[in-house]
Amino acid sequence: MSARTDELEAAYQLAKERGELQALNQIPPIEEWFYWNRVINKFKHDKFYIVHEMLVLKRKPRTYWELTNYEILELFRDIFPELDQRGYHDIFKGNFKPMRSVDDYFHIHIATYIEEYR
């Protein structure tokens, strides 16, 4: 089961098959911090979210969980409180291995639920 509608899931799978998916750190940021970028998720989970963005590291770590203390601190001490204060997003989440479609690049989903889930 996908969090995307059938149409968007088909577009995602086609882009994946064709090798057309952008590396997360190559997606143009809509906001930047020292270690992190906020980017729009082109293949959003549109069954649940009206807005679906991601926080991605500017660098690509060697393994999924290899974040530095500085990157973690910026995320939890600066970015999350700032986004929470704005009141625009409803959730932040990361996926464990069984649910990751991008398994080689640590990223956090930030999203706003569609009205029926609020």
Regions found by a protein language model. Give the residues of each.
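HIT superfamily nucleotide-processing domains
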Residues: 1-118
